[in-house]
């Protein structure tokens, strides 16, 4: 996406400078320029990507046409999930994917120019000194740093990160299969009811029956169940959704 206007970084310092510039551009898109960024990510458009540029700017554009691309590509289709999630959750999801993309670009340069073990380690240490984009946009940058210090001082104390991860995984597990009709009175009865519900569940988009090996998600507005693939929601996206609305319910809300 950047064309030939930006010099190719070749040393650890140059790669880190490139990383820092792209990171600054992405943070700007998700904070100061949030209104413009949100409006640019129109779900009616084709698959869009958020690019951070080395000169601390950003752009939303279609992915490059060349295959394979010159540089690793950022997450594709960020605009599709915009109206199906709360704005805060959507921004957090874009931030997580942006963090992943920044690392892939930095270590792509490292591999391309033959960085050795010590150079890769130094690059990672320099990058790791900076808060992630997700930490910045969620306001957890300072809290995360303090947590890291506390963990280093006392290994016996459990990490808060682990508990948050467990909560997220638990949430996805609950979303992946239809729940029982009501709170169960006894274990045996709850198992029977759960099996009946799963067998009778139908996707609100395609009409197919529930399958145990498929990811499902329920709309909090109409309470219909959908295949994740039918509404373009993955388990990773579901972790960041507090109140999911299907495309139909989202469109109803958008109409004046």
Curated annotation (Swiss-Prot):
<keyword id="KW-0539">Nucleus</keyword>
<comment type="similarity">
    <text>Belongs to the Alfin family.</text>
</comment>
<comment type="function">
    <text>Histone-binding component that specifically recognizes H3 tails trimethylated on 'Lys-4' (H3K4me3), which mark transcription start sites of virtually all active genes.</text>
</comment>
<keyword id="KW-0804">Transcription</keyword>
<feature type="zinc finger region" description="PHD-type">
    <location>
        <begin position="200"/>
        <end position="252"/>
    </location>
</feature>
<dbReference type="GO" id="GO:0005634">
    <property type="term" value="C:nucleus"/>
</dbReference>
<dbReference type="InterPro" id="IPR011011">
    <property type="entry name" value="Znf_FYVE_PHD"/>
</dbReference>
<dbReference type="InterPro" id="IPR044104">
    <property type="entry name" value="PHD_AL_plant"/>
</dbReference>
<protein>
    <recommendedName>
        <fullName>PHD finger protein ALFIN-LIKE 6</fullName>
    </recommendedName>
</protein>
<feature type="compositionally biased region" description="Acidic residues">
    <location>
        <begin position="182"/>
        <end position="199"/>
    </location>
</feature>
<dbReference type="GO" id="GO:0016036">
    <property type="term" value="P:cellular response to phosphate starvation"/>
</dbReference>
<keyword id="KW-0479">Metal-binding</keyword>
<dbReference type="GO" id="GO:0048767">
    <property type="term" value="P:root hair elongation"/>
</dbReference>
<dbReference type="GO" id="GO:0006355">
    <property type="term" value="P:regulation of DNA-templated transcription"/>
</dbReference>
<dbReference type="GO" id="GO:0042393">
    <property type="term" value="F:histone binding"/>
</dbReference>
<keyword id="KW-0805">Transcription regulation</keyword>
<dbReference type="InterPro" id="IPR019787">
    <property type="entry name" value="Znf_PHD-finger"/>
</dbReference>
<dbReference type="Pfam" id="PF12165">
    <property type="entry name" value="Alfin"/>
</dbReference>
<feature type="region of interest" description="Disordered">
    <location>
        <begin position="144"/>
        <end position="200"/>
    </location>
</feature>
<dbReference type="GO" id="GO:0000976">
    <property type="term" value="F:transcription cis-regulatory region binding"/>
</dbReference>
<dbReference type="GO" id="GO:0006325">
    <property type="term" value="P:chromatin organization"/>
</dbReference>
<dbReference type="InterPro" id="IPR045104">
    <property type="entry name" value="Alfin"/>
</dbReference>
<feature type="site" description="Histone H3K4me3 binding">
    <location>
        <position position="220"/>
    </location>
</feature>
<feature type="compositionally biased region" description="Low complexity">
    <location>
        <begin position="146"/>
        <end position="163"/>
    </location>
</feature>
<feature type="site" description="Histone H3K4me3 binding">
    <location>
        <position position="210"/>
    </location>
</feature>
<dbReference type="InterPro" id="IPR013083">
    <property type="entry name" value="Znf_RING/FYVE/PHD"/>
</dbReference>
<keyword id="KW-0156">Chromatin regulator</keyword>
<dbReference type="InterPro" id="IPR021998">
    <property type="entry name" value="Alfin_N"/>
</dbReference>
<keyword id="KW-0863">Zinc-finger</keyword>
<feature type="site" description="Histone H3K4me3 binding">
    <location>
        <position position="225"/>
    </location>
</feature>
<dbReference type="InterPro" id="IPR019786">
    <property type="entry name" value="Zinc_finger_PHD-type_CS"/>
</dbReference>
<comment type="subunit">
    <text>Interacts with H3K4me3 and to a lesser extent with H3K4me2.</text>
</comment>
<feature type="site" description="Histone H3K4me3 binding">
    <location>
        <position position="216"/>
    </location>
</feature>
<dbReference type="Pfam" id="PF00628">
    <property type="entry name" value="PHD"/>
</dbReference>
<dbReference type="GO" id="GO:0008270">
    <property type="term" value="F:zinc ion binding"/>
</dbReference>
<keyword id="KW-0862">Zinc</keyword>
<dbReference type="InterPro" id="IPR001965">
    <property type="entry name" value="Znf_PHD"/>
</dbReference>
């Amino acid at each position: 996406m950047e064309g030939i206007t930006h010099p190719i970084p070749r040393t650890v310092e140059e790669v880190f400078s490139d990383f820092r510039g792209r990171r600054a551009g992405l943070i700007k898109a998700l904070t100061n320029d949030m209104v413009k960024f949100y409006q640019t990510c129109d779900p009616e458009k084709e698959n869009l990507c958020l690019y951070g540029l080395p000169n601390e700017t950003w752009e939303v554009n279609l992915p490059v046409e060349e295959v394979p691309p010159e540089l690793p590509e950022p997450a594709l289709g960020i605009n599709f999930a915009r109206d199906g999630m709360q704005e805060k959750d959507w921004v957090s999801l874009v931030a997580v994917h942006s963090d992943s993309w920044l690392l892939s670009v930095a270590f792509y340069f490292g591999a391309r120019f033959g960085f050795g073990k010590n150079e890769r380690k130094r690059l990672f240490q320099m990058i790791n000194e900076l808060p992630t984009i997700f930490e910045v946009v969620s306001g957890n940058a300072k809290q995360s740093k303090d947590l890291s210090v506390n963990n280093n001082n006392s290994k016996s104390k459990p990490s808060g990160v682990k508990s948050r991860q467990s909560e997220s995984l638990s949430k996805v597990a609950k979303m992946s299969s239809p729940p029982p009709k009501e709170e169960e009175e006894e274990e045996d009865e709850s198992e029977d009811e759960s099996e009946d519900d799963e067998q009778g569940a139908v996707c609100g988009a395609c009409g197919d029956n529930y399958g145990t090996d498929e990811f499902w998600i329920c709309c909090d507005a109409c309470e219909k169940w959908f295949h994740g693939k039918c509404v373009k929601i993955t388990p990773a996206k579901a972790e960041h959704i507090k109140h999911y609305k299907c495309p139909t319910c989202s469109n109803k809300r958008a109409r004046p």
